[in-house]
Curated annotation (Swiss-Prot):
It comes from Shewanella sp. (strain MR-7). SUPFAM superfamilies: Metallo-dependent hydrolases (SSF51556). One of its GO terms (cellular component) is cytosol. Gene3D superfamilies: Metal-dependent hydrolases. The active site is at E200. Substrate binds at H14, D16, G170, D279. This is Adenosine deaminase. Its cofactor is Zn(2+). Belongs to the metallo-dependent hydrolases superfamily. Adenosine and AMP deaminases family. Adenosine deaminase subfamily. Zn(2+) binds at H12, H14, H197, D278. The gene is add. Catalyzes the hydrolytic deamination of adenosine and 2-deoxyadenosine. The keyword Zinc applies.
Length: 331
């Protein structure tokens, strides 16, 4: 399923959506946080998707448990370290880990900049122990409003040298992208790349706004682009990458089934598209699972899967020399 001569990457992967079940259990007990279960085994269904359940509300509840146990900065550092370990152990050559410091800080009123520093420190520690290339993407969580995002941005830009890009995530319908135009002007001025969750809950106009006003060169999910032929042409012509997460889209009810997923439509239209895990801790998947699904459920051939792998490397927020180094390591 995976072509071993091509680097394997995961570009849309939430660090705060990938907390191990045993880590939630241990941190909960360490900090006296009431958990919804009385054993490690019975905790799993509260924090991971089991079977075929597909509901955005259920998904977000599980996600919330992942940050509920971040009681101090050491917990944040541990989770960041384990994210590097998990990326390496799942066979990835390169991953971009994105995180929302406000979301991670809010339950226990941690300092936002302190959370950013703890993530950076945890990743650095992980890279000493594991063979994988990692870059970080900062998230502004739009659901908490403009002021919270401004705070979040301050904490992230204070450490911009450790980031490759900024993302906008959260409630796309309640907090449209135009509320954050000024925030992203600061991101562009700081020299960071931009990706945005768009066209997931809202229509194609949300994607146009992210590209034309925020400055996004990649779009997270973007499933609703397929209803706008002009946008599809634009995406293909300008090599705007779609960070696709099929299993997550199913789990959040963004699509009703794998058969309904537009991945194939994007490929046939010549749009640059990659496979990603989104919140692997919640979905209980790894990148290889997404490639298996792409073959068995989305109907991609081995040649098309190889192209998707190459697309991921092309879409990555890397320099040309870094891209070449990834390929050279596979030779």
């Amino acid at each position: 399923m995976i072509n071993t001569s091509i680097p394997l990457v995961d570009l849309h992967r939430h660090l705060d959506g990938n907390v191990r079940v045993n880590t939630i259990w241990e941190l909960g007990h360490q900090h006296g946080i009431a958990l919804p279960a009385d054993s490690l085994e019975t905790l799993a269904p509260f924090v991971q998707i089991q079977g075929k359940e597909t509901s955005l509300v259920a998904f977000l509840k599980k996600l919330d448990w992942m940050v509920a146990v971040l009681a101090d900065l050491d917990a944040v550092k541990r989770v960041a370290y384990e994210n590097v370990a998990d990326a390496a152990l799942s066979g990835l050559d390169y991953a971009e880990l994105r995180f929302s410091p406000y979301y991670m800080a809010m339950n226990h009123k941690l300092p936002i900049e302190g959370v950013v520093e703890a993530v950076i420190d945890g990743v650095k520690a992980g890279l000493k122990d594991y063979q994988v290339k990692i870059n970080l993407i900062g998230i502004m969580s739009r659901s908490f409003g403009q002021a919270a995002c401004a705070q979040e941005l301050e904490g992230l830009l204070a450490h911009k040298q450790h980031l490759v890009a900024m993302d906008l995530a959260g409630d796309e319908l309640g907090f449209p992208g135009e509320l954050f135009n000024e925030h992203f002007k600061r991101v562009r001025d700081a020299g960071l790349a931009i990706t945005a969750h768009a066209g997931e809950a809202a229509g194609s106009q949300s994607m146009w706004q992210a590209i034309q006003e925020l400055g996004a060169t990649r779009i997270g999910h973007g499933v609703n682009a397929i209803h706008d032929p002009k946008l599809m042409d634009y995406l293909a012509k300008h090599r705007i990458g779609i960070e696709s997460c099929p299993t997550s889209n199913l789990h959040t009810s963004t699509v009703s089934s794998y058969a309904e997923h537009p991945f194939r439509t994007f490929m046939d239209a010549g749009v640059l598209i990659s496979l990603n895990t989104d919140d692997p801790g919640v979905s209980a998947i790894d990148i290889k699972h997404e490639y298996r699904i792409a073959k068995s459920e989305l109907g991609l051939s081995y040649a098309e899967l190889a192209q998707v792998q190459r697309n991921g490397v092309e879409m990555a927020f890397l320099s040309e020399s870094e891209r070449k180094a990834l390929y050279a390591a596979k030779a």
